[in-house]
Amino acid sequence: MRLISSLLLLVYSARLALSLNLTNQTAVLGYWGSNLAGKMGDRDQKRLSSYCQNTTYDAIILSSVIDFNVDGWPVYDFSNLCSDSDTFSGSELKKCPQIETDIQVCQENGIKVLLSIGGYNGNFSLNNDDDGTNFAFQVWNIFGSGEDSYRPFGKAVVDGFDLEVNKGTNTAYSAFAKRMLEIYASDPRRKYYISAAPTCMVPDHTLTKAISENSFDFLSIHTFNSSTGEGCSGSRNSTFDAWVEYAEDSAYNTNTSLFYGVVGHQNGSNGFISPKNLTRDLLNYKANSTLFGGVTIWDTSLAAMSYDNSSETFVEAIHKILDTKSKHSSSKSSHDSSQGLESTSSIALNPTSSISSTSSSSSTSSAISTISQDHTKTVTSVSDEPTTITASGATSVTTTTKTDFDTVTTTIVSTSTLISASDSTSIIVSSYVSTVTQPASTRVQTTTVSSISTSVKQPTASVASSSVSVPSSSSVQPQSSTPISSSSSASSPQSTLSTSSEVVSEVSSTLLSGSSAIPSTSSSTPSSSIISSPMTSVLSSSSSIPTSSSSDFSSSITTISSGISSSSIPSTFSSVSSILSSSTSSPSSTSLSISSSSTSSTFSSASTSSPSSISSSISSSSTILSSPTPSTSSLMISSSSIISGSSSILSSSISTIPISSSLSTYSSSVIPSSSTLVSSSSSLIVSSSPVASSSSSPIPSSSSLVSTYSASLSNITHSSLSLTAMSSSSAIPTSVNSSTLITASSSNTLLSSITSSSAIVSSTTVSNISSNLPSATASSQSQLTNSSTLATSLYLSSSSSRTISTSSTNEYNTSFHAPTVSSTTSSSSTTSLAANKGVNSNSITSLNLESTSSVTSTAYTTDSVTSTTALTSQGPSSSVVSSSLSSTTSLSTSIPVTSSVAPAVTSTGSETSSVVGSGTDSATSSSWTAETSSSAITSSVAASVTPTSSSSASSWSSSSEVDPSTAASATGSSTSSIATASVSGSSTSSVATASATDSSTSSIAAASVTGSSTSSVATASVTDSSTSSVATASATDSSTSSIAVASVTGSSTSSVATASATDSSTSSVATASITGSLSSSIATASVTGSPTSSVTAVSSTSSVEGTASSTIAAAASAATLSSDAASGSSTVTSSATASSSSSAATTADSSVTTDTPSNDFNANVDTAGLWYVSALSSYSVPAGFAWTTIDGFSVVMPSANAYKKRSLPIKATANPALNGAGTWKTIHTSATTTAA
């Protein structure tokens, strides 16, 4: 086995060595990707891997990248084998997954794959050195071994790049080659190639400078499509011979291999040369030029076609020519058709025994060419006992492979000698590999004779041991299912009344933590009530527990489907004639993470009550609807809408209560952390179902209803709430309390409605309060209490005016049928509004509104209404706005004995008061007036209503928080980077961030936020951009606060940083800064239309070698707006400070200090690119350097690469000699900077 492994390794090594040898004068290279045959109407080109299945080509060049820069990316075309529709997001860069796979197949078969830059149809042009260096870095990252997020060939890495260009400048392509070779040197793990395809003309106007200044591995000389007609046979300077002379005399690498470039079909291009006419030239160059490497064919699809009506393909004909021995060649074939190999080996083990082995192998073939490679391997071992063994042998292995094009015969001759004496053993193995490639049309016969040997075994004193450690791996897939069952039963004592009740409870849960399957069953059979709760639950290894259960018994049904850790439902019924129906439904979509090892359920019941039923279902993303409605002479409907994140809960319940019943109901729930439901009716109905969940979203809800009746009644209470807001999540705790006390027959109706929208207008209307009293003495009292808290945002316009309005309407209509009747109504409301949005914690605005009103109405007396309103607004620390508004409205009315109508009292929002009604009662001659008062307040008001005959209370609060953020970044691009992030129309807060980092040419980072009602933050930054940088941040139309920040850091040429905040009603901060820009910097910050406070900061710091710096800062801050609501005037007070500072070592010429040249001035300048100034203006400049002026100083620097900044830092080389003419000085920046 070891011998076979060694032989296979030798075969692979030989093949690899062949694939790396591009200078053996028989190599054939092919261009693939242009599909020239398909464009001529013939068969389309095959996929790349089909050309790598045999030894037809030693290397394949992908053709090609046809454009340098379209929207910042190179453009490439591989015809039918890379789809235009499959591109990387946000670019025109195409994905080529099939080519990725094929490149790896070719490389595994020992065939190198290069990428052509330009191509026959390329619109390619590099016009300056920057284009060349930057493009080299870009194609290395995209196609080579670099790191780029967009890689058309995925993980495949090409083996090099080929320049096939005819546009642009000589210096640009020289810069490209120079940078590429430097990058190659950074990855010594593998060999990368650089090649070019110049025209016949010497010099080539785009490539000769690159060839003379850089070491190219090989050149493919175009012998077609030239101005001289067929091939390179024109003038003296347009022949292949001219390129041989140029390579030997002028190329940087005088050993650069030259390939004869031909087109593969007569219809492919001008200058086609048939194989018959190529034979003489190719054999001549092969015999007489050591630089001749072989033939390059345009392209592989043409080369696979027959030519000039020949039966063979063009590439087959080329191989036949290159494999022919030239009569001028002094080399000899290492194998011919009649030669056989024979070897005899003998091993002497001791004086009396021997082993002899004879093996021979003969092979007959039409050998056209032989490539041989010698391998010698020596292995030395040590044995414990002295042993002398001498053995020798030869083995010949012949392998023949037949393909569509060629027959390949490989013969491996292995000779081994074993010499062992005393304590050392030597094994010498010599292998000879002979490979013959022959066209398919030649018949090859191969005969192999295996060796026959006899042996006598003799034990020796040699001890050999081997140990092989094979690691093992195992995969265990655990599966477990552990059921845990629990059961409970409930019993009931004797019931006084025969009742029926139905309890339905459904809880659906999915547990994401694996524990166990939990079935639970309980049953109870009281006299007339049965409660049963079977619980089933399944737990699989994937930690999902679906549960379901159902039970149906005589009078009561309880169904529970739950994955909860504990559940208890005790209930007791007493003798009442009431039915409570409560239903709660919610859509399921709940994931609960519960860590519990056991489940317990307890149900107990003692029922002496009339029928009662409860059904409930609770889940995390749920809707709970609850509305209790007493039906016998009393009806109450309550609805509330609750929005919290992705959770919506609506609850409703309906109750029907007879006259003589007493019902007390209390319900509270907290979802999703825990949920508890408690109900009671005279005797107690208590239900508890806690649910544990991994999410945290508390939504408390409680309600209670207490009613007492001693006579028949008709009572209707309606409360509705409508909220329209721009928030995406809200949490609304809700409570309702209602009590009714009636001592006589009466009918009362109270209507309370609250509407809230983004304009936040609230109204409260109380109407139609009437009493029909059969007796002479009666009284009615009604109390209205409103209390609400709303967390929202205020709209404060840019002109410093507040558009805050509120309106309320109270209507009182009372009819009396007895002479002694009194009616009293009082109302009070408190509203607080707070906004706290954005990243600025100081951006807090609160609004407190208090209103108190009372109405007293008595027969023959005066009614009065009093209303007081107070407004307080608290803004950021730099701005405090306080306003208090109050109004009092009084109403006096003379009421007849039988009826009284009080005119409407309206509060509407104009900050003025006027009499809107007046009159005189005819019976009493008393006069009455009504006033209208208003205040500039916009608020959200929630109402609590308590009528005379029944009382109820409801309150709600809403809080919302939205934080949409958008971020974009671009990192490490050698050419240009553009990062843009924007947010539009966000009602609460917006954050847009854009950054560009380490871009060598240009960077643009822009961030913008538009139309955000609460707060906006826009940030744009550019870091280490070598040529130009633009950072722009803007925040527009933000009603509360805006922050715009733009910064540029470390830009060597020019920088622009702009930040602006526009029309922000509360506070704005705009900051622009530039740091370390060598040439020019512009920093601009502006704030427009901010009525409260504005801060504009502009800072610029520039330093070179730390000897001079300047800082300019300007700010407008501490702006305060105070307004007088009564007079409608406002005052803005602001203060501004500006400061500047600068420092410098010295001024004018004294800013040059005497020290030796150093290489720490700028680590990113080009090679030998340090900047120095000479003390003597008449100093003679060394070769390769030139005078220039920087910051007013005369400077000597390398002339070729002056003022160049590289993407990758390169340490400067040694400083030029002064030749005794003067002393070098290190440059510093100018001395004085004046603050603007």
UniProtKB/Swiss-Prot annotation:
* Family label: Belongs to the glycosyl hydrolase 18 family. Chitinase class III subfamily.
- Show the segment(s) annotated as Disordered: 326-367, 449-497, 584-625, 804-836, 868-927, 946-979, 1125-1159
Signal sequence region: 1-19
Where does this polypeptide localize?
Secreted
Q: Which UniProt keywords apply?
A: Glycoprotein, Glycosidase, Hydrolase, Secreted, Signal
- Per UniProt, residues of the GH18 domain are 26-325
> One GO biological process from the UniProt record?
chitin catabolic process
GO terms under cellular component: extracellular region; fungal-type cell wall; fungal-type vacuole
Q: What is this protein called?
A: Chitinase-like protein PB1E7.04c
Write down the InterPro entries for this protein, in alphabetical order. Answer: Cts1-like, Glyco_hydro18_cat, Glycoside_hydrolase_SF, Glycosyl_Hydrlase18_Chitinase
What Enzyme Commission number(s) apply to this enzyme? 3.2.1.-
Q: Which residues are glycosylated?
A: 21, 24, 54, 123, 225, 237, 255, 267, 277, 288, 309, 715, 737, 768, 786, 813
Sequence ranges of Polar residues compositional bias = 339-351, 810-821
- Please tell me the species this chain comes from: Schizosaccharomyces pombe (strain 972 / ATCC 24843)
State any single GO MF term.
Answer: chitinase activity
Any S-S bridges, and between which cysteines? Answer: none
Catalytic class of the enzyme: hydrolase
Under Gene3D superfamilies, the record lists: Glycosidases
Q: Main localisation, per the record?
A: secreted
Compositional bias per record (Low complexity), positions renumbered to this chain:
352-367, 822-832, 1125-1156
